[in-house]
Amino acid sequence: MLTKKQINEIREHLEKAQNPLFFFDNDNDGLTSFLLLQRFIGRGKGVVVKKLPDVDISQYRKVDELKPDYIFILDKPEVSQKFIDKAKEDNLPIVWIDHHNVKAPEDKYVDYYNSFLEDGKGEPVSYLSYKIANQKKDIWIALIGCISDYYLPDFYEEFAKEYPELAKKDPKTPFDALYDSEIGRIARILDFSLKDTTTNVVNMMKFMMKVKGPMEILEENTTTQQILKRYTELNSHYQKLLDRARIGVKDKLLYFQYGGDLSLSYNLANQLKHEFHGKFVVVVYVNKDIANISIRGDNARDVTLEAIKDIEGATGGGHNKATGAKLNIDDLPKFKKRVEELVK
């Protein structure tokens, strides 16, 4: 967890920022972190960073376009030095809040905060943002971010008392709350909404900046129509992929490979891990000549790094029990064989 001093420093940055620009990861932890901080100060715009794993110089066009006075980076493990140098050149402060197991940036121009580096716990950025904003009315937004990132926060019972109709009673794991409750369904609606056109994602974000409570998301009207439509479309495809993946259980390993126009790998990996607790889950999405991989299981980070070791161009990393990797499809057989040996 961040220290009280660090939390106060971030609050000061937020209060000072008159036109902040938030870059955040393309998942519920990133989205809800942005929403919690934007709703706290009532200003600022958000940019979803779909490129993995870093915020690179190509993203700076949004800075040139929107002319912010502050840059906040949320839930991203890497930021390119070229991006930092350009912000420095433009005299724009950068506040970077993360929770991944990575080294702090060497460039001290960046105000860097990482919950993993503080005590090794690595609470999600949505949890940190909730503690920073300290707005009880947004407890449900924070909870969505936390359970989506496999973290059961200390405010779960408080949430359950406020929204008993949405909560699962006494969940044993974060994914119990995510997959066996109504707040979990709302989380999946938002997650799938992020996988839409840029225009629709921006409209969803604008709606979420003003929404007063979770039930508004479930009410079908002109504002929520596209959000719910996207969920229905993707959920149908997602359930079919799940059914196919469930067949691929072998000993300790569940390995599933698929293709298509859209990656749902981390969603599939999370739910399969929930359903098959004792299995090591590997979900591979193949697009042209690249394989994007989501991995879930004990020591997933060590297994991932060992499996991609010495594979040219391969990248990977993440948390202890949840990681991602990217490599050329020609190297997939080698990667799969290594994983099988490491988890047998």
Question: Language-model features: where?
Answer:
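Accessory alpha-helical/coil subdomains and C-terminal extensions
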Residues: 154-240
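Long, well-ordered mid-to-C-terminal structural blocks that present hydrophobic/aromatic surfaces
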Residues: 217-277
